[in-house]
Structures are given as structure tokens and as C-alpha cells.
């Protein structure tokens, strides 16, 4: 029987999920996105050629894989068409490989307008969203006024629903935020223009995945963003609008949770965060600059500079709990090359001297904490591109071993570069 594997981020996103998903898709028949939208940025490097995907699953470059956008994903038709065009120009037969759930909520222009208007209105208290309409689209879904992909297939009904929801949002834009209204006719025309094209790719995702499971075909579920950005379990309110944790797989695809066999947590060898929000181990110093520069820490979606810091084991323990992580993939180990010492956060100290080893449940709880850091010797040797454990210096091996001890979870994969070949698979999630 084939295994069903989840690959998800354990930090604030940008852990290197895209590369690992691409690597593991060689052994899977289906790759499924189950949450988020085109706010994700998954970078693949294959034989030196770089591909950045925001919405389409990272298995799209494999000719033996069907890629699925599940119902938990908020879908922006314009972003999807842009990505499809880019891939087709590279010779990728997207229509043969991509399938979409009719139940995906649509992101439409007024969602983006609202997202941008809200961030601007927040001023210094801005959350740091991508401005791509993700949050407003999820709001419409929960409020039961959202439009879904399947609504496009009845033009008359879609027009009626669109008029109603746009009247509501345009009122907010013009009267509350003092912004321009979004044009109804143009929005309607653009949406209906691709209805037939999308319909050709729509399937009952729940039924398809269940049949695949019964046939023993391996399925890989590709998470977006990271655990610490989860709407319920992240550093609220500095979070995304979806469940980025393993629980989102079932709700965002219709796949039964008891059928998941392995959860692979992607963990960078240090930590980064894009946008606002608490970050106890942040390094605003020369070492932070080193990590940011050597790690090329700029967002694949927004281009924003990421905030670097030491690896936070307190937060990673929470990720292990929430996701029932089977094993970790440690990425960007090579970025630590050349540092005299490396540090790991093992606790949060409060002003009264008390030390916590679990994360607070909201952003406010982080305001007065300072990280308790454990220091380990660094290494001068080059680990970039290493493909076997024997090539790693002893200090790097000691660092890996210490992380396994602290997290009580094995590190099953080690990544030492952006290319799919620059990887050590110690334990294969599909084996």
C-alpha cells in the first residue's frame, strides 16, 4: 500500500518546503495543496533552473504526478492563469496535471482592495499581510457569502451573487476606508471569461483522493506558510487566515485524518520571519546580517527582507505537539557554515526570572520574554551541497544530534543547498 505523507512548515514559513515536496513527488502520484492561497512562495531549483510557485502544487514539474488544489485553498483566478501561462511557456502541460476543487473560495479584486486598505489603515499596527486578498476571502467563506469556483459555472446565478457581495464590500471600501469602489462589470466579465477553462479541471477531490488511497497510490499533502502562522495556534493576531497545521489537511481536502501515515516538519537550521509579529530569537546584529545575506532571505512572494534569528526549540516543541510530527527535514544547514558558535533557544525568561519552556498562546505573551540560549561550537568547514552524513563536520553533526534530543523527534532529511540533489534522505517518509 502507498503511504500518505504531509509536508508542512514548522516555523513562520520560508523553511524550504517547495524543494522537499518536489524531491518527494518522485514517489507520489498526487500532490495536494490544502490551505492558503497565492500568498505562498515555493521555490524549486532543478538543474540550476529556478521556478517559483505560489498557487499550483510543487509537483507540477513531474510528468507522473497529478496536482490538486483542494477546497481549503482560496483561489485567485488571475494569479492561477498567470502561473499556468508561466509554466506552459516552459513546456509544462499544466492541463494534463492540474485538478481543482469546485469548492475553492474565489479571491476577487475587491478582496485585494480590502486587504490593502485595511493594512494602510492600521498604520504602525499593520500585520504585514501580502495584500493579496487572502484574509478577506476567508472571511467571506466563514460568513457564508463567499463565491466559489463552482459558482462560475452558472453565469446568471454568479452575477446575482457577485452583485450582492460587491455591494457590501464596496460600501466598506468607499464609506469606511474612503477608497475607490471596485468595478462590478469588469469583475464579472473577467471572472466568467475563464469559467469554461476552470471547469475542465474541476473534480470531486474527496472522492478522487479516497479512490487513490484504496488503490494504494501514494499521496503527498503540501502545506503553505508555517505552523507559527496558523490562525488558531500561531502568534495571533500576527498570523495567516488558514490552518497551516496538519489538521488542515482533512478539512482542506476532504481526506480522512486516520489515513495519514507520516508528517514531515520542515525546519530551517535557524529562524526567519517576514512582516510584523513577535520573534524572541531575532538577531538585529552582524550575525543576523550574515544569516540573511548567506541564506538569501527575501520573500518569494513579496520580495520583503526576512528577519533572521537563532533556532527556537520552544516554538519547535509546540510544532511537534500540534502536528504530531513524525520526523524533521533540516534545511539551510550550510548557512551556519563559518560561525564560531551557534545558539539554540531552549526557554523564554520573564522579567521576574521565571523561565517558560512552552510558547504563549497570543502575541502579547511574548512582549517581555528574552530567549534562554544554549551555545554550541560552530564549524568552519563548508557543508554546501553535501550529500552524505560522512561529509558533515563533527560540530554540525553535534548540532543536529542536540536538536533531536531537545525535540525528541528524529531529523530524517538534511538539506544543504537549493537544488533537489543537495539533500540527504536518512529516512524516506514513503518507505
Curated annotation (Swiss-Prot):
InterPro entries: Adenylosuccin_syn_GTP-bd (IPR018220), Adenylosuccin_syn_Lys_AS (IPR033128), Adenylosuccinate_synth_dom1 (IPR042109), Adenylosuccinate_synth_dom2 (IPR042110), Adenylosuccinate_synth_dom3 (IPR042111), Adenylosuccinate_synthetase (IPR001114), P-loop_NTPase (IPR027417). Gene3D superfamilies: Adenylosuccinate Synthetase, subunit A, domain 1, Adenylosuccinate Synthetase, subunit A, domain 2, Adenylosuccinate Synthetase, subunit A, domain 3. Keywords: Cytoplasm, GTP-binding, Ligase, Magnesium, Metal-binding, Nucleotide-binding, Purine biosynthesis. The gene is purA. CDD domains: AdSS. Plays an important role in the de novo pathway of purine nucleotide biosynthesis. Catalyzes the first committed step in the biosynthesis of AMP from IMP. IMP binds at residues 14-17, 39-42, 130, 144, 225, 240, 304. It comes from the Bacteria. The lineage of its organism: Bacteria, Pseudomonadati, Pseudomonadota, Gammaproteobacteria, Alteromonadales. This is Adenylosuccinate synthetase. Substrate binds at residues 300-306. It is found in: Cytoplasm. HAMAP family: Adenylosucc_synth (MF_00011). The active site is at 14 (proton acceptor), 42 (proton donor). Its EC number is 6.3.4.4. Homodimer. Belongs to the adenylosuccinate synthetase family. GO terms for molecular function: adenylosuccinate synthase activity; GTP binding; magnesium ion binding. It comes from Shewanella woodyi (strain ATCC 51908 / MS32). Its main location: cytoplasm. It catalyses: IMP + L-aspartate + GTP = N(6)-(1,2-dicarboxyethyl)-AMP + GDP + phosphate + 2 H(+). Pathway: Purine metabolism; AMP biosynthesis via de novo pathway; AMP from IMP: step 1/2. The keyword Magnesium applies. Its cofactor is Mg(2+). It is an enzyme of class 6 (ligase). SUPFAM superfamilies: P-loop containing nucleoside triphosphate hydrolases.
Amino acid at each position: 500500500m502507498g503511504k500518505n505523507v504531509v509536508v508542512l512548515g514548522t516555523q513562520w514559513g520560508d523553511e524550504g518546503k517547495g524543494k522537499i515536496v518536489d524531491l518527494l513527488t518522485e514517489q507520489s502520484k498526487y500532490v495536494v495543496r490544502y490551505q492558503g492561497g497565492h500568498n505562498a512562495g515555493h521555490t524549486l531549483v532543478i538543474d540550476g533552473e529556478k521556478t517559483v510557485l505560489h498557487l499550483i502544487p510543487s509537483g507540477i514539474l513531474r510528468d507522473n504526478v497529478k496536482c490538486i488544489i483542494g477546497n481549503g485553498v482560496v483561489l485567485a483566478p488571475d494569479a492561477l492563469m498567470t502561473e499556468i501561462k508561466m509554466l506552459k511557456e516552459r513546456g509544462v502541460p499544466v492541463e494534463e496535471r492540474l485538478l481543482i476543487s469546485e469548492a475553492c473560495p474565489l479571491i476577487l479584486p475587491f478582496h485585494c482592495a480590502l486587504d490593502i486598505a485595511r493594512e494602510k489603515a492600521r498604520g504602525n499596527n499593520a500585520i504585514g499581510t501580502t495584500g493579496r486578498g487572502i484574509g478577506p476571502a476567508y472571511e467571506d467563506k466563514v460568513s457564508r457569502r463567499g463565491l466559489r469556483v463552482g459558482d462560475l459555472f452558472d453565469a446568471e446565478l454568479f452575477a446575482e451573487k457577485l452583485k450582492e457581495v460587491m455591494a457590501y464590500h464596496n460600501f466598506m471600501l468607499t464609506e469606511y476606508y474612503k477608497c475607490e469602489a471596485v468595478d462590478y462589470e469588469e469583475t464579472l466579465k473577467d471572472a466568467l471569461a475563464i469559467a469554461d477553462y476552470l471547469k475542465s479541471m474541476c473534480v470531486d477531490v474527496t472522492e478522487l483522493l479516497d479512490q487513490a488511497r484504496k488503490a494504494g497510490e501514494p499521496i503527498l499533502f503540501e502545506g503553505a506558510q508555517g505552523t507559527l502562522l496558523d490562525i488558531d495556534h500561531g502568534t495571533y493576531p500576527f498570523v495567516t487566515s488558514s490552518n497551516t497545521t496538519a489538521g488542515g489537511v482533512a478539512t482542506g481536502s476532504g481526506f480522512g485524518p486516520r489515513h495519514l501515515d507520516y508528517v514531515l516538519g520542515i525546519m530551517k537550521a535557524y529562524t526567519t520571519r517576514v512582516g510584523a509579529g513577535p520573534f524572541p530569537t531575532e538577531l538585529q546584529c552582524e550575525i543576523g546580517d550574515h544569516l540573511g545575506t548567506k541564506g538569501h532571505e527575501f520573500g518569494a512572494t513579496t520580495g520583503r527582507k526576512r528577519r533572521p534569528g537563532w533556532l527556537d526549540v520552544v516554538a519547535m516543541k509546540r510544532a511537534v505537539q500540534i502536528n504530531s510530527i513524525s520526523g524533521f527535514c533540516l534545511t539551510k544547514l550550510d548557512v551556519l557554515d563559518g560561525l564560531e558558535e551557534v545558539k539554540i533557544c531552549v526557554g523564554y525568561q520573564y522579567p521576574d526570572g521565571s523561565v517558560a519552556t512552552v510558547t504563549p498562546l497570543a502575541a502579547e505573551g511574548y512582549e517581555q520574554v528574552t530567549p534562554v540560549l544554549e551555545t554550541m561550537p560552530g564549524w568552519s568547514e563548508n557543508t554546501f551541497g553535501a550529500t552524505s552524513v560522512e561529509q558533515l563536520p563533527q560540530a554540525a553533526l553535534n548540532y543536529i544530534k542536540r536538536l533531536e534530543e531537545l525535540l525528541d523527534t528524529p531529523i530524517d532529511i538534511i538539506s544543504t543547498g537549493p537544488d533537489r540533489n543537495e539533500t540527504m534522505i536518512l529516512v524516506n517518509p514513503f518507505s
